[in-house]
């Protein structure tokens, strides 16, 4: 049985969907053995407790540095024997030290079709509210493995600050 750790920041609706899939037999080869939140008020912690799953809050606010926070997070994951990590609305960036400790074993659930509706303020229902406000006709979710690889980035070849579309060269 694969031991899964779920990291959450809020209500835990994705966590609940995973638990429901396990309860009804749709997922048969995994169990959620640990839920970690950075938010002590996250309802996801209650969802975990209701399923007799270890639920802990590890918040960056508890530590003097991000490095200490990251080390504690990694130690808890290792100590619990977690084999797969699911980021289910976890609003804290995962550092390379954790990604490297769990290569191809961290899955992120993002509530939009990436690259649309990503970044600061785009989480949970806010993503869908913003998509509806923009009149988007197709929306969805993205589930992807987390790694440290940046595929490609480049500055724009010309200044486009005054226009919505750059003219052709």
Label the predicted regions.
Residues 1-43:
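N-terminal Rossmann-like dinucleotide-binding module
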Residues 43-46, 96-97, 144-154:
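Mobile beta-alpha loop/short-helix "lid" or hinge segments that flank ligand
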